[in-house]
């Protein structure tokens, strides 16, 4: 019984140190990015961040970019159904095309680049995704996507910063 309690205590201590190490890696990595709070929140909300390596954290950020691009595409489709203004429709369709490119080209390129250690390509792909969010925003006089475009831009910028940190 005494040895079981000792083993349990040791296990709990190791678990605590592991969590602290993961948080330290996240904090150290996120300090290298321009959006520290977004970086920390995104990584701490993903159980894969306990992997203990920076390239995996970059991959998690790329996945967050993909999720946001997909959410934006769904939101754009809903907005298209609800608008009759031809200028707004045209801009929304252009943004849909942009976010298809982010999801179907930039994200896979960055994912593969992080996986194979080609961090310059990961940085370029995520910088492209950030620029695409800005391009979408510029299509409108008053954008219905401002908050989402900014979030996508910031997530992609964090992912690009992590890739740059690895160079």
Q: Which role does the model predict for each range below?
A:
Residues 1-24:
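Terminal membrane/secretory targeting segments in land-plant proteins
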Residues 21-167:
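Folded extracytoplasmic luminal domains of secretory or organellar precursors
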């Amino acid at each position: 019984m005494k040895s079981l309690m000792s083993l349990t205590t040791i296990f709990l201590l190791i678990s605590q140190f592991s969590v602290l190490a993961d948080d330290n890696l996240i904090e150290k990595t996120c300090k290298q990015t321009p959006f520290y709070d977004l970086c920390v929140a995104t990584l701490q909300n993903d159980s894969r961040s306990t992997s203990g390596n920076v390239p995996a954290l970059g991959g998690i950020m790329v996945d967050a970019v993909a999720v946001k691009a997909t959410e934006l595409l769904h939101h754009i489709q809903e907005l298209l159904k609800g608008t009759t203004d031809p200028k707004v429709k045209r801009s929304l369709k252009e943004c849909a095309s942009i976010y298809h490119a982010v999801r179907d080209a930039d994200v896979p390129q960055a994912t593969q680049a992080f996986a194979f250690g080609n961090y310059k390509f990961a940085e370029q792909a995520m910088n492209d995704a950030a620029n695409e969010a800005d391009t979408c925003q510029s299509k409108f006089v008053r954008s219905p996507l401002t908050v989402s475009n900014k979030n996508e831009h910031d997530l992609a910028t964090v992912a690009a910063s992590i890739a740059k940190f690895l160079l």
